[in-house]
């Protein structure tokens, strides 16, 4: 099968969407399929075979993210020459619209993965800040109506999306490459940041944006450290809130107990998961919470707010705890796991076992079956 992927975010930009595309593309190619990616260009990007880059501009609100200018005199000729079987778009914006136009022009099936609750990200779009969340949901629903299949990562997101579109919606979680977690250096994190063996490491990993609710985690940690001074909170990643979060940590008097690593290499990220004792996650907007799945693969129990996709990534009381958005409850669950080493070890074992259900290989096979069914429906509809 020959698959065209259109995305508004791709390497070297880092995000859950980019990681999802990387992992899925690798697995599809391992299964013998040909994958071609259409994405924005970034300064100093690495040229890759099968990746077509489009001129782009940095966004005013977050310069690290580039918005593609979806214009190319060669795009239709390129799509024709590639002889694609299906087009798969990963956002409803500039590259997503280009993918739709190409699918329409060449009569190809169009698949859309709904990675993000777009209504929760309006504050990043200066041209759309006045749009209400209801309007954004309707607009994204209208894009779904143009597609032949909409893929979502969890059942709770399916229920939300299905209310706003007539298109078939199917649940296929983003798979995680468990092989990455086989050979890890569990001591790397402590060596890198000079953390003693007695100190417990709390970890958060992700883009530091307002919607990730990292300020909540800092407020919680300020309570945790009162009882457990021999802990450290490591925050991996960068984003528009990086500086304000650093300032908040210092204002709260925990600046010396919180380590902001900035962006790390993939190997360093894996070793960070492997070297931590507990993963913390407070986002209210995740469609899946890919980092929660990665934490599982490292055998790392998590405490997370029970919201949207995160609620389906953690089995409450088995491989972690889900809480309400209440600081006292969240703090209580962290303290419970820090107090009880045996409970934490058992949850770590459970997390590792349950990670088998979200392997990237099995999810890629499920995606291929969805492609095949969509292509078949499209062909049948054409002859009716």
Locate predicted features.
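Donor nucleotide-sugar binding/catalytic pocket of nucleotide-sugar-dependent glycosyltransferases
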Residues: 52-55, 133, 137-186, 261
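N-terminal subdomain of nucleotide-sugar transferases
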Residues: 1-55, 362-368, 372, 382-383
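Conserved donor-binding/catalytic core segment of Leloir-type glycosyltransferases
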Residues: 195-221
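Aromatic "clamp/platform" in nucleotide-sugar-dependent glycosyltransferases that forms part
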Residues: 284
